[in-house]
Amino acid sequence: MSLLHQARFFTTVNHLRDLPATAVPEVAFAGRSNAGKSTAINILCNQKRLAFSSRTPGRTQHINYFTVAPVKAPDPIAFLVDLPGYGYAEVSGSAKYHWQGLLSDYVQTRSQLSGLILMMDARRPFTDLDCQMVEWFLPTGKPVHVLLTKADKLTNSENAKALRETRKMLEGYAEQLATPVPLTAQLFSSLKRRGIEEAQRVIAGWLSLPEAQAAAPAEQPAAPGASE
């Protein structure tokens, strides 16, 4: 069983000064307000109500932390970080400014951040705001793994095209970097439970969870991103 299944809520943060003062690794989840981010987090952690999604897209404007650790462990060994969804037009200007600043500052400056899970609707990958998120994060030299969510909405050929185009975009970003960084992508469907184990392997590897260390002799570190 994945240790992610034992994730539990830790804290909510509205300012960078309130981020947990810990040294444990973090994996952040980012995406547009309607990309299915909260649902995907719940599925990956095998829980129904770990991450809450507002009925009104764009309402959640805080950073939510979830601790990853065995149930009786006194301290977390890692964190999952649910970032505010972006791109919803009805958010007020002042709230949007604060929100964008919180997002950009966190992904660019948080030293504990080990990697970014970027969720995009498979029907509309790489919107302008998705590109902005990638461009904020790339200079950190840390990996990005794209989950093309709602893959159940597309045919097999449409999914193949979306994945191919996403990987091509990521290759373009990789060419801009002086030092190679893993920029990978996969198809994902919460409804059909597609791609769950692959995404869990990526996250476990970034967080150095015991399950990833146990699997290391059998598979190479780059394998999780190599889905077809």
Curated annotation (Swiss-Prot):
Q: What does this protein do?
A: Necessary for normal cell division and for the maintenance of normal septation.
Q: Which SUPFAM superfamilies match?
A: P-loop containing nucleoside triphosphate hydrolases
Question: Which residues make up the binding site for GTP?
Answer: 31-38, 58-62, 82-85, 149-152, 183-190
Residues covered by the EngB-type G domain: 23-209
Instruction: State the family named in the UniProt similarity comment for this chain.
Output: Belongs to the TRAFAC class TrmE-Era-EngA-EngB-Septin-like GTPase superfamily. EngB GTPase family.
Molecular function terms from GO: GTP binding; metal ion binding
Give GO BP annotations, semicolon-separated.
Answer: division septum assembly
Q: Does the keyword Metal-binding apply?
A: yes
Cofactor(s) essential for the protein: Mg(2+)
Which keywords does this Swiss-Prot/TrEMBL entry list?
Answer: Cell cycle, Cell division, GTP-binding, Magnesium, Metal-binding, Nucleotide-binding, Septation
Q: Where does Mg(2+) bind?
A: 38, 60
In the UniProt record, does the keyword Methyltransferase occur? no
Under the heading Pfam families, the entry gives: MMR_HSR1
Of the GO CC terms on this record, one is: cytosol
Concerning InterPro entries, the annotation shows: G_ENGB_dom (IPR030393), GTP-bd (IPR006073), GTP-bd_ribosome_bio_YsxC (IPR019987), P-loop_NTPase (IPR027417)
State what protein this is by name.
Probable GTP-binding protein EngB
Quote the gene name from the UniProt entry: engB
